[in-house]
Amino acid sequence: MLNRISRKASSFTESVIREMTRQATLHGAINLSQGFPDFPAPADIKRAACDAIEADINQYAVTWGAKRFRDAIAAKTKWHLGLDIDPDREIVVTCGSTEAMIATMLAVMNPGDEVIVFEPYYENYGPDAILSDSVMRYVTLHAPDATSPVWHYDPDELRAAFNERTRAIIITTPHNPTGKVFTREELRFIADLCIEHDALALTDEIYEHIWYPDAARGIEHVAMATLDGMRDRTVTINSLSKTYSVTGWRVGYAIAAPDLINGIRQVHDFLTVGAAAPLQEAGVYAMGLPPEYYNHLQTEYQRRRDFLLGVPEETGFKCYRPDGAYYIITDISEFGFQNDVEFTQHLIKNIGVAVVPGSSFYRKSEMGAQQVRFCYCKKDETLEAAAERLRKLR
């Protein structure tokens, strides 16, 4: 029988991250792999969703997003980023940020166009490039070393990646999997290259509220769209998932100039029609939460980060301290395993903890063969139980 699967679908595998969740369930391991909380979503946000269902907001919303939700997104963007967004012309609501990214790439990339991505990178971007017939160009994020205490890129390498075929660059800040928060200076350098080469910036900012202040180093989240010259050439992608601990709701959005949004809306319409109407209404409530909510979120995740950082370090891992998001990349070379996949299988089956093989974040598996990623968006009891199991490695 002929192969009935397309060449595109045959050129990538299922998500390694989500496979690790399935293996954690199969073997009864504690899941520190996939980035979803195991603690309850905020009660008031859940109540807003229930109220919306009871109010019979259960039919299709406008394809590109319910009016009230788009207005709420625009209002939050104004107070948080200082940007005036037209909710009727510059926003599209999608089924999660995952759909926002693929819809954007399908809308703006032509066959053979190049998209630059920093490596290591979130695994979805590879299939997104394949599905949109675009070519990925990779720029290395170097791990902290003698030249820099944080993950960093080489400006010369980045400049060399831009050429006449460059259509876009993907920037994830705070970054998954490294936890890097791009500085204003780094983003300005990227912005200048985008302007010089007439390229778009596709920014994945789903962790915009999950970063850890450091006065000495000036850690802050900077949105690319706020930089001079970038308002109309940036597609800002976001969602409810991480900020409001509702990863299963699948409600995201993209903000961009009207011509870009028109294209993204067209693709979105025929991909999914629209995001869940009652959950968009709950999003109206979430977007109106006061600054204290975000301060508490930040404090809680910083506390979890600080707890989990100490455990791998005392058991033989070399940890790279994240400045944002809720992941920790670690070096496993001290354990003597052949590669990350072999090590993660050992952790799941013999130790009872599931993490993500580092190779899933690189184009060549050998580049991440001595790395694994931990996730700490979990209950204290979960992290403490995982710590107890990890101490068996000593």
Model-based region annotation:
Residues 57-60:
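A short acidic, glycine-rich active-site loop
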Residues 1-5, 10-11, 16-28, 36-52, ...:
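PLP-dependent class I/II
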Residues 64-65:
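Short beta-strand to alpha-helix junction loop
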